[in-house]
UniProtKB/Swiss-Prot annotation:
Belongs to the MnmG family. FAD binds at G10, G11, G12, H13, A14, G15, V122, S177, Q366. Its cofactor is FAD. It holds the Pfam family GIDA_C_1st. GO terms for cellular component: cytoplasm. PANTHER family: GLUCOSE INHIBITED DIVISION PROTEIN A, PROTEIN MTO1 HOMOLOG, MITOCHONDRIAL. NAD(+) binds at residues 269-283. SUPFAM superfamilies: FAD/NAD(P)-binding domain (SSF51905). NAD-binding protein involved in the addition of a carboxymethylaminomethyl (cmnm) group at the wobble position (U34) of certain tRNAs, forming tRNA-cmnm(5)s(2)U34. It comes from Rickettsia typhi (strain ATCC VR-144 / Wilmington). This is tRNA uridine 5-carboxymethylaminomethyl modification enzyme MnmG. One of its GO terms (molecular function) is flavin adenine dinucleotide binding.
Amino acid sequence: MLKYGVIIIGGGHAGVEAAAASARLGVHTLLITLKPENLGEMSCNPAIGGIAKGTLVKEIDALDGLMGFVIDKAGIHYKMLNETRGPAVWGPRAQADRKLYKKVMYQILTNYRNLDILYGKVEDIQIKSSKVEAVILNNGIKIFCQKVVLTTGTFLSGFIHIGSMKIPAGRIYEEPSYGLSNTLKRLGFKIARLKTGTPPRIDGRTIDYSKTTLQQGDQIPRPFSELTDAIDVPQINCFITKTTAETHDIIRENLDKSAMYSGQIKGIGPRYCPSIEDKIVKFSTKLEHRIFLEPEGLEDYTIYPNGISTSLPKEIQYKLIKTIPGLENAQVLRPGYAIEYDYVDPREINITLETKKITGLYFAGQINGTTGYEEAAGQGIIAGINAALSVKDQEPFILTRATSYIGVMIDDLTTSGTVEPYRMFTSRSEYRLSLRADNADLRLTELGINIGVVTEKRKNIFTKKCNNIEKTKLLLNKLSLTTSKLAKIGIQVAQDGKYKTVLDLFKIPTFNVEQAIKIFPILRKQNNNILQLLYIEAKYASYLTRQYADINLFQSEEIQLIPKNIDYFKIPSISLEIQEKLSYHKPTTIGVARRISGITPAAIMAIIIYLKTKYSDGSSK
């Protein structure tokens, strides 16, 4: 009889991270996917990272995940977004060679210890006494297991829409999954529909780049992974063009033919990644919209025109493409399309990503209502970790809003749910100055080491980095000049006759690392990433101190548990509406209860008093 500790269904960005994490924890793991060669497939844009998303990638890497390492082996255009603004909103991003990314991912996973990969399609999940028992393939084979992580992406009852055409598919040229949709409905999960889309692909050899604007990447690419010393993949340029009045006229004249506006699509699309039809309708006074022409590979002439996702008929797509500067003679290789799919209300899962209804069943990725590779991967690694820890009868691994963007995302989803595709933004985090891309490993890697999900290689690299940080900090506190000497070289400080260390100088708004190196050449020998980290920590020290105080308050509420069997209707001082809301959401801690919409401070205090009265020893087990 075939039996595994953890089975992952789906080999997208959530699935590969879940599978690898489970395997790293020493659990016998099986990844079931329709096409093994499509592991980590970039279904839409050929890029990883961005504002907030880049921080998610760094956090995944901090837990020894795959995404950051793989993009460093396949990244062809690196750019730090928002670098002219504060470090809390910097967004590392890299264009990928789409085929190379898949190739590297396949090579890694097919050689992963404790991980088997099976080509197949799961039709059903066998449940016994509200507990996972096995998965059933479409050929009738039953594979027994203790835990299942469902990472179905856009495949649950998926339909592609191109104009009036409606094609059953989970991705173009790939069949959807109806069996698992039926399974979830049978088990009583709350199912709804969401929509996303992708633009047409263009033959780069037919583009007139002289009519576009060159967009260069960073001169020195900054790796995502702490395992990467430097990027050795050749780097290439992207280009920018824009829509025209003629483009907009064509779209307006044919809105009734768009699947989005004809009523054919019922699912809600992503607010922050709208189709070109949505842009023209919702921003009707805007005369043009930027389009980023992004190469899909070093040896691939396919161009991804980021900014014109559409579900218009093919012939209309071809027509509007011709109105865009540089694309007048462009050949369309594949039309754009919208895709509609099932998802589950994420309030049906716990913060471990295990479902509330079925023990041993975990959800990760678009099934939880998110959009984006990075959001999916962040959920995948947590689901994989917790499924494996549960197999080993160990405590679950919880990331909170105070420790990570992954924690913010999971808390948002499980507390508030979502009725539209959820995308991560820096604005979603109240602690974003503390949760930066540059300190992800310092926040999370030790936590990963403690539970055993971090390999020895990364552990050694992390330990060495921590030692180097301390040595560099000592050096920066040692290197100093008097205020009079600083004034002579143009550094304006209060003339109090005291020595100013480099860390003191970092607090001056106009002072930076480059100036420090110029004044103290010995700093050239130091790791620049560590210098930048200490520069940020020093410059924003007063803000960070206040934020850490807020975090301590937050964490005190996060550890104040609410018992699973609490009866809110026995707390007379809160309204029936709030009692019903709390009974539905079943918050696990006081902190989670406070974040539920409509829960008043008075209600929170009533719960705290009730818990103290009910549980005289102060516990809430």
